[in-house]
Amino acid sequence: FFFQAEDGIRDYKVTGVQTCALPIFQGTGTEGRVTKKDIIAFVEAKKSGSAPIKTVGSTPSAAPSTSASPSVSLGGDVEIVEMDRMRKLIADHMVMSKQTSPHVTSYVEADVTNLVMWRDRVKKSFEKREGEKITFTPVFIEAVVKAIKDFPLINVSVDGTKIIIKKNINIGMAAALPTGNLIVPVIKNADQLNLLGLTKSVNDLATRARANKLQPDEIQGGTFTLTNVGSFGNVMGTPIINQPQVAILAVGAIRKKPAVIETPMGDAIAIRHMMFLSLSYDHRVVDGSLGGTFLRRVADYLEQFDENREI
């Protein structure tokens, strides 16, 4: 007897078994196909006189549901905690994003020594004058806004086969909540704010996000998102796109590292402040050339930051 095996083995010969002796039964292969192991098991069962293999009737069995989550073994010492409403929304949104957008992530390392020196110089006087602290986040956002102006096809969304180019630049900034959940307040028209305006917007939204005092419209309408994984001490990340946007930037921790720099006397090794930037983007509309060039441009703006700048 000959049969076509699911596992790619064709014309496998089982001696001593006639075609008419084989019942129709459910195989263990893909979609119930009969495999070589199934035939051998049938022959051995026939020889030993053990319980027959369960046959399949004329009515096909229902296909298993693909939407149900795989069962999880609850053996051992476990505690079951129901997701709260926000965690359920986040979970659904993350799964939907991965199913919608083919994600690609590019990385670049940036020398932000000038930026660190600038902040060290202005942070005390800024806090004394404004009554609030200045972080690196508004500078990151400023660099992103400049790069989006250079590459507007990053600031888009997708509707079927249509690319919707957004004229407003609304930057979402992912913020961790005391509960462990995540929220993304949005700085609307970030391109119309100077560095002082961005700093005040970042501080205001972050403070009210932690206090659960954001308005609904303040977490909607983003066109690009920034997430600071460096705040957890992480050096880089592979962020998931915040739908319906097509790109998200993760900024890593700033660390002192030895690096090669160019001097009038030639190359030299110096201690520099370095960080990684990682950009995840939707490969349906953002190719590696656009994504990589945009990311490099953001890094260039950070590296070229004027440490003598006033705010």
Where are the model-predicted features located?
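A short glycine-leucine-enriched loop at secondary-structure breakpoints
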Residues: G16-V17, T28, E218
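Single conserved hydrophobic/aromatic residue that forms the stacking wall/gate
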Residues: F1-C20
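Short acidic, glycine/serine/threonine-rich helix-capping segments at coil-helix boundaries
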Residues: P23-R33
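C-terminal catalytic/motor cores of large multi-domain enzyme assemblies
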Residues: R33, K37-D38, F42, K46-I311
